[in-house]
Amino acid sequence: MNRREFLKCGAACGALASAGCATGDAARSAAAVGKSGDCPFRLGVAGYTLVNFKLDESLKMLKTWDVGEFCAKDFHYPLKASAAELRELVKKTSDFGVHLYGAGPIITKTEDDARRAFDYCATLGVPTLVGVPAEVFDASKGWAGNRSSRKMCEVCARLADEYKINFAIHNHGANPKTGNPNLYPTVETTADLITDLSPRIGFCVDIAYTHADGFDPSAILRKHAARVFDVHLRNVAVADNGSSGAAADKGVIDYVRIFRTLKDIGYSGVCGLELANAYGKPSEANPGADPSWVPRSIGYFRGLMDSI
């Protein structure tokens, strides 16, 4: 499927998402944008979902899908842009009826990196920085050569207090084929590094990786409720290492229970759909990769939000 075909698909499926209709047993009629019924949290889209599209295209798709929450990524809102340039991009985003709820994930390896990231978030006007405070132990390995850093966690916790911006560490999975076992693989390994630090440093809980690593996502959300600042949503076709993408209503993760848990703990942030693998070519890992997964998943999740 080329870009033009995808955009046509997105427009057609957007009507499904906006109406809140979705296939699958758990689908329900949905409310309007973001918050549904008395559900305390909102539905958004993580920037990485639209990594293959320019900002204008992405904003048009979000408008088509009637999604009003978006997480900024560097390829849409460049980290190296001037403050004036970033403010122009924020205005453009707002003109499409879209609100930036956070930024990241952003890897920070030095205090200068971290301060630059916080300055970026302050200019964007977002309350949450999704980050990966890291140190390099083997530069030849690229991403795999980074590992968790207590020192950088301390730096980011201090800056979170200074800027009054929450810092949410993203778990990237313990399986070396799909994640990095040395770099905040799970929420629990991250918790060991931060629970004595500022309450402004916490978690961006990736539900699929949490499930793939053998944890009960609902139990993790309850245990760490006070430090959950962001949640990434995607589903997997089978109970594997977290790589087999699926539309939300076709996977194996129990999102009905997870959404009820989020409501029970009073989570009032955004749950961001992160489904970039839907835009890849079908493969053994993604045998049914299909761009319609995104609007279809939006409709499904809205239905769940309306039903809980």
Language-model segments: what does each one mean?
Residues 71-88:
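Glycine-rich, proline-tolerant flexible connector loops at the mouths of alpha/beta enzymes
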Residues 10-16, 35-37, 56-57, 63, ...:
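Active-site acidic/histidine proton-transfer and metal-coordination neighborhood
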Residues 41-46, 70-72, 100-105, 129-131, ...:
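Hydrophobic faces of well-ordered beta-strands that scaffold small-molecule active sites
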Residues 4-16, 20-42, 51-63, 184-205, ...:
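Histidine-acidic metal/acid-base catalytic patches
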Residues 47-53, 74-79:
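Extracytoplasmic "Venus flytrap"
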Residues 80, 139, 281:
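Glycine/Thr-rich phosphate-binding loops of Rossmann-like dinucleotide-binding domains
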